[in-house]
């Protein structure tokens, strides 16, 4: 009986201390470029296929995108030379970045491809999409 009491007291004590040892993993934060993107489906001229464009709808003032001269209406082509084929691709690339990194953004503007090097130094940090 004494042994059972010691086991129960130990179990209660350890379960109360579990919070001290268990630290839930914090959500990873990544820099926010400061753009809102619209995914636009564009049919080919013959109608046989559809491509998706990632059009920049708006830019948050004082964000890395604003300082980098990205403009609403630009079509996002690539981040760090990795072609953007989905929103999750863009998020994955940004999740690999940290504050003070730079980011090479490739956009199409008025039919012309432009590459813009952006500093993420003033980026707000985020942990969700």
Predicted regions and their residues:
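Positively charged n-region of N-terminal signal peptides that target proteins for export
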Residues: 1-4
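C-terminal motif of bacterial Sec signal peptides marking the signal peptidase cleavage site
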Residues: 14-16
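PDZ-domain C-terminal substructure recognizer with occasional recognition of PDZ-binding tails
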Residues: 18, 77, 92-129
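PDZ/PDZ-like peptide-tail recognition elements
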Residues: 18-54, 58, 96, 119, ...
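Extracytoplasmic
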Residues: 30-34, 49-53, 71-72, 85, ...
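Terminal peptide-recognition signature
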Residues: 35, 56, 65, 73, ...
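N-terminal post-signal-peptidase region of extra-cytosolic proteins
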Residues: 55-63, 85-93
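Conserved PDZ fold ligand-binding element
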Residues: 65-87
């Amino acid at each position: 009986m004494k042994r059972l009491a010691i086991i129960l007291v130990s179990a209660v004590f350890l379960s109360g201390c579990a919070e001290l040892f268990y630290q839930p993993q914090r959500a990873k934060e990544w820099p926010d470029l400061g753009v809102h993107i619209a995914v636009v489906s564009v049919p080919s001229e013959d109608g046989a296929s559809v491509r998706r464009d990632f059009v920049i709808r708006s830019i948050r003032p004082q964000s890395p995108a604003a300082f980098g001269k990205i403009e609403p209406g630009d079509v996002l082509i690539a981040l760090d030379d990795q072609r953007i084929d989905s929103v999750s691709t863009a998020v994955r690339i940004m999740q690999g970045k940290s504050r003070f990194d730079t980011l090479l953004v490739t956009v199409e503007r008025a039919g012309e491809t432009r590459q813009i090097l952006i500093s993420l130094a003033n980026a707000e940090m985020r942990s969700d999409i």
